[in-house]
């Protein structure tokens, strides 16, 4: 299939530039992937669409401070996005501006050196005057909100661009399907017999890289580290046996569970399943682990839109997106949600 098949017109005013005043005070579009029928609800009423015995799987990753501004010796400003969290002598970073090998950048009294240009707007950096590039970013960088918000990070983003269950640092972007979730709603779901299971996938480089190929088959997917605890796998098996549904809270959870599907089915150990998800899910894919997906409204031509289309059915999703635009739903990270089942 062509990447252009997943283009659509998204009016600028439909992109939520800020989070709602109250977390979770958003709308919910409910799509039946078998019939294409649509219902409109409030996110706070999610429990009406999940049932006793269902299992909601959440991503406990935490967004790290990864966005830093530096200045070249010429005075030109360079924006950097850290792509690795290790504390080795060099780190990869996405950059905005013009760089060449050997350039020296000043940031908060320290010099960053461009050791190598790795392609696709990525540079390998070292630093002088501090123990590591990672340490410089952790001391001085800010939370990397998405570029399509077209603004600098503000105080509100420090809280609201993290999920309420963020625990394990490592992501350069939030698992945005979780941004609307609240402790109160999780408690309502629990009282209704919906269990919660945890896992971690660190959102990485691919979130910021566009698809540059004409066909999906040519696209090489990025890798993202994940860890699925043994208890979560046990809960998945228990849910299957009892006839409940495995509900993925977001595309990050979906990628991890589907990448590990074969190992989950055969699992009998006590250690977590770890891996690097490089699976590119698009229409034609046969889902093995999840039964429902709670997600955002995604950007045109994005890999997460293609994953959602694979689960919902491309025609059903196109129709639902058209209706969402017409009914003035808010799109992207800080926007409304949809439940597909």
From Swiss-Prot:
Catalytic function, reaction form: 7-aminomethyl-7-carbaguanosine(34) in tRNA + S-adenosyl-L-methionine = epoxyqueuosine(34) in tRNA + adenine + L-methionine + 2 H(+)
Keywords: Cytoplasm, Queuosine biosynthesis, S-adenosyl-L-methionine, Transferase
Name assigned to this protein: S-adenosylmethionine:tRNA ribosyltransferase-isomerase
GO molecular function annotation: S-adenosylmethionine:tRNA ribosyltransferase-isomerase activity
Presence of keyword Transferase: yes
Pathway the protein contributes to: tRNA modification; tRNA-queuosine biosynthesis
Transmembrane segments: none
A cellular component annotation (GO) from this entry: cytoplasm
GO BP, sorted A to Z: queuosine biosynthetic process; tRNA wobble guanine modification
Gene3D superfamilies: QueA-like (3.40.1780.10)
SUPFAM superfamilies, per database record: QueA-like
Protein function: Transfers and isomerizes the ribose moiety from AdoMet to the 7-aminomethyl group of 7-deazaguanine (preQ1-tRNA) to give epoxyqueuosine (oQ-tRNA).
Pfam families linked: Queuosine_synth (PF02547)
Top-rank EC class of the record's enzyme: transferase
Family that this chain belongs to: Belongs to the QueA family.
Species the sequence originates in: Chlorobium phaeovibrioides (strain DSM 265 / 1930)
EC number: 2.4.99.17
Subunit structure: Monomer.
NCBIfam families linked: PRK00147.1, queA
Entry's localization field: Cytoplasm
């Amino acid at each position: 299939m062509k990447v252009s098949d997943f283009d659509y017109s998204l009016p600028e005013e439909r992109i939520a530039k800020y989070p709602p005043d109250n977390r979770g005070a958003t709308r919910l579009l409910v799509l039946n992937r078998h019939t294409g029928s649509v219902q409109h609800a409030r996110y706070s009423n999610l429990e009406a669409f999940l049932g006793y015995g269902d299992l909601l799987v959440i991503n406990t990753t935490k967004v790290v401070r990864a966005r830093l501004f530096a200045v070249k010796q010429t005075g030109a400003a360079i924006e950097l996005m850290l792509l690795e969290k290790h504390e080795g002598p060099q780190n990869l970073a996405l950059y905005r501006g013009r760089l060449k090998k050997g350039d020296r950048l000043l940031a908060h009294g320290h010099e960053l050196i461009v050791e190598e240009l790795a392609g696709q707007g990525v540079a390998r950096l070292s630093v002088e005057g501090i123990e590591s590039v990672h340490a410089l970013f952790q001391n001085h960088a800010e939370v990397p909100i998405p570029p399509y918000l077209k603004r600098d990070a503000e105080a509100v983003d420090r809280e609201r661009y993290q999920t309420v269950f963020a625990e394990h640092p490592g992501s350069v972007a939030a698992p945005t399907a979780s941004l609307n979730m609240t402790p109160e709603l999780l408690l309502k779901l629990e009282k209704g017999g919906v269990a919660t299971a945890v896992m971690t996938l660190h959102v990485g480089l691919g979130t910021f890289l566009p698809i540059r190929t004409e066909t999906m088959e040519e696209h090489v997917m990025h890798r993202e580290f994940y860890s699925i605890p043994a208890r979560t796998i046990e809960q998945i098996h228990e849910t299957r046996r009892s006839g409940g549904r495995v509900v993925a809270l977001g595309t990050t959870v979906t990628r991890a569970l589907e990448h590990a599907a074969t190992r989950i089915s055969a699992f009998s150990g006590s250690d977590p399943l770890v891996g690097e998800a490089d699976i590119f899910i698009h229409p034609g894919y046969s889902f093995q682990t999840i039964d429902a997906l709670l997600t955002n409204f995604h950007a045109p031509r994005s890999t997460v839109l293609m994953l959602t289309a694979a689960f919902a059915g491309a025609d059903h999703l196109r129709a639902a997106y058209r209706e969402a635009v017409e009914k003035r739903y808010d799109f992207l990270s800080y926007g409304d949600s949809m439940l597909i089942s």
